[in-house]
Amino acid sequence: MRHSTTLTGCATGAAGLLAATAAAAQQQSLEIIGRPQPGGTGFQPSASPVATQIHWLDGFILVIIAAITIFVTLLILYAVWRFHEKRNKVPARFTHNSPLEIAWTIVPIVILVAIGAFSLPVLFNQQEIPEADVTVKVTGYQWYWGYEYPDEEISFESYMIGSPATGGDNRMSPEVEQQLIEAGYSRDEFLLATDTAMVVPVNKTVVVQVTGADVIHSWTVPAFGVKQDAVPGRLAQLWFRAEREGIFFGQCSELCGISHAYMPITVKVVSEEAYAAWLEQARGGTYELSSVLPATPAGVSVE
């Protein structure tokens, strides 16, 4: 477990709230949804409207790119075959072809306009921050994340399980594997799972305010379609609305120093009831947040 982790909030009734709400939290069986797959080449499953739009746009542009690639490849192969010296004894001497030149000017313009017409609404949807149901401030540090719920007076830090802050050395060991198991994970989640998690309710608009404390980091959760640089001295915003309950992993996506690879992100999306129970417990005082809402492997409930 982490050597020293604190929560700021009301200091009274911590033990009572912990006992009262742990049972409610443990009834929440959370499937691990947003995570990289060995040998995977595609996107993680979409879990927000923003991610769904990005996936559609990627597929749309991929069709255009594939068509252009196939057309150009076939054109080159035809030119090599048709105008080979053996088949073209007398080389052509024309200098231009006006209809062809007009066509290869207009067609790219039409393609670019089409891409832009479908891309801009997706971009604007990401940049237009709606009214928040939940606001979370995220601060990037070397090499961990800090989370603050300003409306709830809750704040905590999040370290990778197996990092020096949790008693490890960023390598898998029997002790680290035991920590993962105690948190509800398996060794497959090493380098992804954290000792505490950002917890949000399902189907609610979450606005995340992102900043950095030392160098530039980047808070990224692929399943939500969000990535925002955490720049010291600046406060940026992103938003998402998770459409399904589960556990979603992300990672710092901006090279930030020697332990850049060891600052993952864990987001747990839960029901409104479980979220309310978590808030009540989290306000209770100082304890390990990993006990607030156990991470549970897919289909496994904690009894």
Swiss-Prot record:
Record text on cofactor binding: Binds a copper A center.
Sequence intervals crossing the membrane: 60-80, 104-124
Enzyme nomenclature, EC number: 7.1.1.9
Signal peptide start and end residues: 1-25
Cofactor annotation: Cu cation
UniProt keyword Nucleotide-binding present: no
Predominant location category: membrane
Membrane topology: Multi-pass membrane protein
PROSITE patterns (alphabetical): COX2, COX2_CUA, COX2_TM
Binding locations of Cu cation: 217, 252, 256, 260
GO molecular function list: copper ion binding; cytochrome-c oxidase activity
Subcellular location: Cell membrane
UniProt xrefs under InterPro entries: CcO_II, CcO_II-like_C, Copper_CuA, Cupredoxin, Cyt_c_oxidase_su2, Cyt_c_oxidase_su2_TM_dom, Cyt_c_oxidase_su2_TM_sf
Alphabetized UniProt keyword annotations: Cell membrane, Copper, Electron transport, Membrane, Metal-binding, Respiratory chain, Signal, Translocase, Transmembrane, Transmembrane helix, Transport
GO BP terms, alphabetized: ATP synthesis coupled electron transport
PANTHER family: CYTOCHROME C OXIDASE SUBUNIT 2, CYTOCHROME C OXIDASE, SUBUNIT II
Family classification: Belongs to the cytochrome c oxidase subunit 2 family.
Function: Subunits I and II form the functional core of the enzyme complex. Electrons originating in cytochrome c are transferred via heme a and Cu(A) to the binuclear center formed by heme a3 and Cu(B).
Protein name from the UniProt record: Cytochrome c oxidase subunit 2
Name of the gene this protein is made from: ctaC
